Amino acid sequence: MKGGLKGALKGGLKTALYILVAIPVTLTAQRTQAPRDITGYWVSVVSEDWHWRMVTPRKGDFTSLPLNDEGRRVANGWDPSKEKPADACKPFGAAAIMRVPGRVHITWADDATLRIDTDAGEQTRRLQFGKLATRGWRVNGRGEIEYFQQGTDAPPPSGPLTWQGYSAARWELAPDPKTVRNAVFFAGGLGTSPDGAGTIVPGTFGSLYVVTTQLRAGYLRANGIPYSEAARVTEDYDFWTDDVGAEWFTVSTTVEDPKYLSAPFVTSTDFRKEPDGSKWRPTTCAAY
């Protein structure tokens, strides 16, 4: 793609060129801006970390977790016999819920709010659009793709801390090679933009980016591995289709916690789309 852009520039563009992607920021545009329809039922496919995800690990097993001294102290002091009913959902908070085996149901609560329900723990996440800085891409004078950010993130609202916290989301729209090529021609006076009005439409390439804060303290794993109220969770959801036509998404999750972690804790989790909700089995935190 890079060479093709350079060729187009050499063919007729004499001056430095910057083409900005117009990413709609109005709340009503968020649903229609989705790179694809991501609604429906999805099941987690556990292909790694089976012995930490499918069963409760033994006390003191914090393999692969970057706990600091305080985190290890709390994890080693975990006593399940002292857990209260109010603690039952600690392993189902936003910092860990996508790693819990089960199904998720994705719907739009409204044009600016994506809703994710889980059958494991009966949790509901609400991803709010229009709260994060706008991110886009442009083609520079060397025919290279550059990413840029405009504006600032809105602060989270005040209120009680919850298991799922406050999640702000945006679409990370990447350039479609064909769209970029058309954009270069348009800027050089050699053609028209994809929509005929100067707006570069990013096509079907892209992912979902989510930042979650305002979390109630919980567990990264069911054996008492802690995360605190200061935890910050960032997620990248990539939606894709395999060679046999099955739809998938992969969520890369990063948990940062200055109280209990010495470094970010990063995981990658796969989900496959199901045809309907016939296998949906809601299970409370206590019964899981």
Regions inferred by a protein language model and the residue ranges of each:
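Residue-level recognition of conserved structural "scaffold" positions that shape functional pockets
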Residues: 10-11, 19, 47, 176
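Bacterial N-terminal signal peptides
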Residues: 14-26
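Short, low-complexity intrinsically disordered segments enriched in A/P/G/S/L with frequent Arg
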Residues: 3-16
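Short intrinsically disordered, low-complexity coil segments enriched in acidic
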Residues: 1-3, 20, 148-150
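PEST-like low-complexity, intrinsically disordered acidic/proline/serine-rich tracts
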Residues: 29-288
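Intrinsically disordered, low-complexity regions enriched for glutamine and histidine
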Residues: 11, 28-29
